[in-house]
């Protein structure tokens, strides 16, 4: 009876729909019912399976209604055997969510299931655990909730847009994926787009650092420039024009003229033949990050700020390779959608539709920042790992910050041991110094050797460059003022390097008769030398870049009161030879450090160095640490030391204060010996770009040292009429100039060289004036008579002399006062080096030195220089006095110290 009741119920229900459905899914239902629920095949089997089973029977006729269930024995011949394939299908059907979703959708669209619970019993044969699956599917997020745009908004909400510079936020992709309830691969898409805009940076595997939007405008400005270099705007215009032409062929008017079919492949070819895409063939270049940067470039270079999706896809995706396989092209278009979703979440673009003749096309409009005029023009360092495809085409524009001041010339050779000395000096313990971080030093030292090697091989061009260099004319010095001198020296903090004497070639230069110079200036000038070609054209200044010798020479005009112009040197430099220069007169000179160094290095560090001067004659040693290379024949004079004068150490006067028209009393004073009515002039820093009023009044030779090779700084005032320099020694010109060598405080044993003496015959008569004889820079005439001043300490600034000089050669030497604060403390400045002479000597080799330097004193000075701390920086005069008392001095120096009490 129960079976009959079920049959009647089945007849009442709309069986036709269920029967159709059963026939449709007969095979799947048969497999599931037979192999899964064989144990349940009882007379209570639902009517859902009866039509399926009976329809498969060949003996089934409409007259035979299934009153009783069919026995399993009757169906055995028609059943497929139990195979692994059938088992796999069953497992897939049970476990795959997609298959279950399809089954659910099919059931929802069945009319019988939209009515009453007519088939409650049919649900009894569902897969075991299906109720739990339904609960799980209720918890699963919808497609909208899983969208990348919404996920990116949730991701960005976790971090501040403008984080503080002090706080460092680290993003763990695993934690974020668990927190947001998504897979980690979804977070990868977001992070790659954010990394392309420098909002995040990779720290480690699955670890990123959050930077925020601080550098976003600069990044967009950089991408805009790169997009302009890639000519993306022209490519978009070309593609749009091709599409317009295609529409013209399709709709009309050109077909009448026998023009080709619009489906012609030539018309549909948007390949990269005419406008090659910047995409490369490597896998990294096709990454989502690179595509994101290019996608942003399209918006930044577009005039309308609207980019359609198909144009972006044709430009950014290599259609020439993917044209046969449209599935790959569509996949990459989906990646553009992913990028657009993230950019939309960042509020940089929004989705719009462009209406054309064919209909609406998806497009995106840029709503982010467009005005980059207020942004600093300095380019971001777009590394090759981020934009490798732009490295070849836009390399010169990306590395604008790389100044080409590391170029050297083959005429100046460098000893390789100087780099070892620099590394040794840098490794010593010393007071903290600000590092040079300007754009002028952006090139690494590792590339220095390659640049040098290349320049050494190109000697012919370099010699031609030096031979074409113009040197302004120098006027004869006034004899009445020839021995007046004022020196304002600021201590430098570069390491000292010395090289062999044989490394100095003849300095070739050509004097210009008009005082105008024409020197090719490199396109990428350093920050420390703000010398424009216009300035060079109007000022008697010669600027020779990237050599190892730094010289500044000048002369005063005949008949006029000498004036001094100060030049700032752009850093230390190597002296390529043991140079002993004979001066014909003294003049007021001031040397300052690089303004970038003045800002970086602490003021107390600059104040800690002093300069002493005493007349000495010395040949520069080949090695700073060698104690036997000081060739100084000691010949004492009449025993009287030069008088003392107030010393004014130049400490921390900023370069901005030293402008024309404003006196700097702490930098120089006028010497009244010989011409008391001489008026002091002010200093002119070269970085102020102030042109002298009288171009013929002062001439300077400025030779810049390459970055990273810091050494001596040489100041040479020229006092000779112009001579043409020829390679032969007989035709070499002569410069009778006092010279000053400023050493680095890092290597204390090496002395400061200062030459106030004169070349030629020196008369012992008090009234005779020096003869401004010639001095050649050639090796054959390099040995000349000179007085040199040696001191590893700092050099002080002389003031007007009030006491007469007993030495005829030093008749007009200004006296020195060691302490301007304490006028009572007078004492003779004795040299740090044991070598002390008063008479001119010629340059000799190291083995001719009768008085070698004491290694003990040299080593002591070396330690004192490095172990100065800012806490111990007091008055430099007191420190020097204590250092002089505690230093091991020679007998000659002690005698000088005793005799110094006379002028007091």
Curated annotation (Swiss-Prot):
DNA-binding residue intervals: 143-212, 283-368
Chief localization: nucleus
Stored Pfam families: E2F_TDP
Location of this chain's protein in the cell: Nucleus
Tissue: Widely expressed with highest levels in skin and thymus and very low levels in brain, muscle and stomach. Expressed in trophoblast giant cells throughout placenta development (at protein level).
Induction or repression: Induced at the onset of hepatocyte polyploidization.
Gene Ontology molecular functions: DNA-binding transcription factor activity; DNA-binding transcription repressor activity; DNA-binding transcription repressor activity, RNA polymerase II-specific; identical protein binding; RNA polymerase II cis-regulatory region sequence-specific DNA binding; RNA polymerase II transcription regulatory region sequence-specific DNA binding
Keywords: Activator, Cell cycle, DNA damage, DNA-binding, Nucleus, Phosphoprotein, Repressor, Transcription, Transcription regulation
BP-aspect Gene Ontology terms: chorionic trophoblast cell differentiation; DNA damage response, signal transduction by p53 class mediator; hepatocyte differentiation; negative regulation of cell population proliferation; negative regulation of cytokinesis; negative regulation of G1/S transition of mitotic cell cycle; negative regulation of transcription by RNA polymerase II; placenta development
One Gene Ontology cellular component: nucleus
Modified residues (Phosphoserine): 96, 411, 833
Record's compositionally biased regions (Basic and acidic residues): 252-269
Disrupted gene: phenotype observed: No visible phenotype; mice develop normally and live to old age. E2f7 and E2f8 double knockout embryos die by 11.5 dpc of massive apoptosis and dilation of blood vessels and show increased expression of E2f1 and Tp53, as well as many stress-related genes.
InterPro entries from the UniProt entry: E2F, E2F_WHTH_DNA-bd_dom, WH-like_DNA-bd_sf, WH_DNA-bd_sf
Annotated region described as Disordered, given as residue ranges: 61-80, 252-283, 560-628, 846-904
Its job: Atypical E2F transcription factor that participates in various processes such as angiogenesis, polyploidization of specialized cells and DNA damage response. Mainly acts as a transcription repressor that binds DNA independently of DP proteins and specifically recognizes the E2 recognition site 5'-TTTC[CG]CGC-3'. Directly represses transcription of classical E2F transcription factors such as E2F1. Acts as a regulator of S-phase by recognizing and binding the E2-related site 5'-TTCCCGCC-3' and mediating repression of G1/S-regulated genes.
Similarity section: Belongs to the E2F/DP family.
PANTHER family in the cross-refs: TRANSCRIPTION FACTOR E2F, TRANSCRIPTION FACTOR E2F7
Domain notes: In contrast to classical members of the E2F transcription factor, atypical members contain 2 DNA-binding domains and regulate transcription in a DP-independent manner. Both DNA-binding domains are required for DNA-binding and are proposed to form an intramolecular structure that is similar to the winged helix structure of the E2F-DP heterodimer.
Assembly and binders: Interacts with HIF1A. Homodimer and heterodimer: mainly forms homodimers and, to a lesser extent, heterodimers with E2F8. Dimerization is important for DNA-binding. Interacts with MN1.
Protein name: Transcription factor E2F7
This protein's encoding gene: E2f7
């Amino acid at each position: 009876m129960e079976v009959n009741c079920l049959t009647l119920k089945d007849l009442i229900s709309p069986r036709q729909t269920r029967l159709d459905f059963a026939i449709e899914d007969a095979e799947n239902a048969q497999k599931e019912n037979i192999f899964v629920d064989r144990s349940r095949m009882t007379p209570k089997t639902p009517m859902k399976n009866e039509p399926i089973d009976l329809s498969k029977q060949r003996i089934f006729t409409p007259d035979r209604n299934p009153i009783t269930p069919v026995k399993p024995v009757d169906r055995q011949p028609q059943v497929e055997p139990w195979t692994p394939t059938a088992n796999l299908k069953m497992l897939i059907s049970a476990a795959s969510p997609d298959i279950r979703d399809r089954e659910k959708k099919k059931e929802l669209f069945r009319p019988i299931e939209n009515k009453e619970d007519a088939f409650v019993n049919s649900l009894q044969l569902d897969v075991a655990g299906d109720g739990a699956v339904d609960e799980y599917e209720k918890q699963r997020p919808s497609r909208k909730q899983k969208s990348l745009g919404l996920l990116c908004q949730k991701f960005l909400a976790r971090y501040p847009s403008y984080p503080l510079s002090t706080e460092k936020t680290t993003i763990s992709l695993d934690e974020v994926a668990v927190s947001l309830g998504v897979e980690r691969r979804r977070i990868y898409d977001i992070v790659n787009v954010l990394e392309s805009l420098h909002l995040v940076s990779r720290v480690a595997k699955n670890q990123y650092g959050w930077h925020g939007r601080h550098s976003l405008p600069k990044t967009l400005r950089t991408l805009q420039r790169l997009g302009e270099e890639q000519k993306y705007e022209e490519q978009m215009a070309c593609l749009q024009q091709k599409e317009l032409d295609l529409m013209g062929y399709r709709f009309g008017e050109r077909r009448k003229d026998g023009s080709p079919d619009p489906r012609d492949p030539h018309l549909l070819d948007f390949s990269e033949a005419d406008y090659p895409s910047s995409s490369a063939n490597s896998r990294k270049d096709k990454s989502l990050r690179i595509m994101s940067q290019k996608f942003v470039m399209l918006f930044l270079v577009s005039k309308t700020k609207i980019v359609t999706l198909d144009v972006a896809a044709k430009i950014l995706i290599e259609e020439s390779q993917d044209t046969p396989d449209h599935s790959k092209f569509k996949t990459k278009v989906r990646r553009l959608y992913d990028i657009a979703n993230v950019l939309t979440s960042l509020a940089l673009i929004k989705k719009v539709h462009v209406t054309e003749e064919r209909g609406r096309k998806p497009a995106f409009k840029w709503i982010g920042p467009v005005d980059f005029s207020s942004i600093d023009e300095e380019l971001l360092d777009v590394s090759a790992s981020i934009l490798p495809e732009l490295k070849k085409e836009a390399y010169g524009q990306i590395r604008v910050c790389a100044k080409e001041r590391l170029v050297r010339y083959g005429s100046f050779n460098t000893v390789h041991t100087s780099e070892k000395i620099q590394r040794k000096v840098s490794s010593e313990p010393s007071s903290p110094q600000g590092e040079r971080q300007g754009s002028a030093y952006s090139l690494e030292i590792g590339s220095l050797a390659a640049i040098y090697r290349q320049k050494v091989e190109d000697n012919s061009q370099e010699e031609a460059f030096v031979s074409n260099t113009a040197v302004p004319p120098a006027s004869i010095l006034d004899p009445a003022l020839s021995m007046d001198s004022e020196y304002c020296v600021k201590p430098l903090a570069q390491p000292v390097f010395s090289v062999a004497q044989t490394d100095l070639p003849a300095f070739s230069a050509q004097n210009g008769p008009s005082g105008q110079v024409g020197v090719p200036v490199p396109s990428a000038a350093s920050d420390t030398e703000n010398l424009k070609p216009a300035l060079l054209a109007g000022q008697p200044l010669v600027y020779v870049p990237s050599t190892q010798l730094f010289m500044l020479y000048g002369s005063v005009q005949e008949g006029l009161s000498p004036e001094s112009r100060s030049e700032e040197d752009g850093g230390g430099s190597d002296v390529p030879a043991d140079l002993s220069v004979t001066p014909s007169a003294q003049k007021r000179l001031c040397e300052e450090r690089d303004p970038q160094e003045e800002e970086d290095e602490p003021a107390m560090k600059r104040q800690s160095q002093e300069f002493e001067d005493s007349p000495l004659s010395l040949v520069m040693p080949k090695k700073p640490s060698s104690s036997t290379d000081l060739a100084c024949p000691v010949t004492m004079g009449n025993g009287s030391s030069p008088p003392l004068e107030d010393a004014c150490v130049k400490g921390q006067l900023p370069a901005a204060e030293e402008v024309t028209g404003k006196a700097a009393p702490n930098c120089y004073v006028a010497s009244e010996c010989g011409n008391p009515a001489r008026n002091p002039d002010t200093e002119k820093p070269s970085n102020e770009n102030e042109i002298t009023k009288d171009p013929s009044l002062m001439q300077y030779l400025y030779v810049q040292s390459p970055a990273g090779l810091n050494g001596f700084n040489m100041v040479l005032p020229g006092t000779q009429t112009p001579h043409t320099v020829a390679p032969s020694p007989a035709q070499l010109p002569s410069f009778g100039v006092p010279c000053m060598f400023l050493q680095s405080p890092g290597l204390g044993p090496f002395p400061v060289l200062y030459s106030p003496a004169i070349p030629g015959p020196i008369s012992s008569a008090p009234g005779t004036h020096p003869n401004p004889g010639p001095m050649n820079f050639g090796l054959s005439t390099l040995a000349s008579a000179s007085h040199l001043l040696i001191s590893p300490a700092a050099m002080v600034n002389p003031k007007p002399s009030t006491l007469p000089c007993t030495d005829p050669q030093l008749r007009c030497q200004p006296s020195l006062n060691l302490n301007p604060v304490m006028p009572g403390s007078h004492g003779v400045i004795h040299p740090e080096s044991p070598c002390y002479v008063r008479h001119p000597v010629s340059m000799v080799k190291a083995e001719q030195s009768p008085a070698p330097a004491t290694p003990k004193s040299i080593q002591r000075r070396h330690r004192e220089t490095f172990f100065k701390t800012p806490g111990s920086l007091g008055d430099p005069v007191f420190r020097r006095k204590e250092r002089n008392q505690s230093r091991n001095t020679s007998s000659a120096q002690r005698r000088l110290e005793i005799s110094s009490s006379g002028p007091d």
